[in-house]
Amino acid sequence: MYYNKIRWEKGVITIEKINKKLRAERLKRNLTYEDMANLLGYKSRSTYMYIERGFTEPRLEVMKKIATIFNKPVSYFFNLKV
């Protein structure tokens, strides 16, 4: 079983579940990869695209920014009950 640096626990949360939520929230707001990259201060749309597609693991600071853009708590993306 593959675990990334955060050591996701099997069956609790996976990077794929986070990615699906990121994509769903972005599409719900009719935002493109380029829009998200601009909102996050990235020069290239591929930087955000790599996060959403799971090629790059997002840092907590990035997840906080994304949560703010989507008006969601960070815990929403991790299925945490706070």
Predicted regions span which residues?
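A short, Lys/Arg-rich alpha-helix, primarily the initiator
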Residues: 2-28
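Residues within the helices of the helix-turn-helix
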Residues: 23, 34, 64
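The alpha-helix within a helix-turn-helix
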Residues: 26, 37, 67
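Short alpha-helical DNA-recognition segment
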Residues: 30-50
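Residue-level recognition of specific faces of alpha-helices
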Residues: 47-50, 62, 76
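Short C-terminal boundary/hinge segments that cap the last helix of small helical domains
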Residues: 60, 68-82
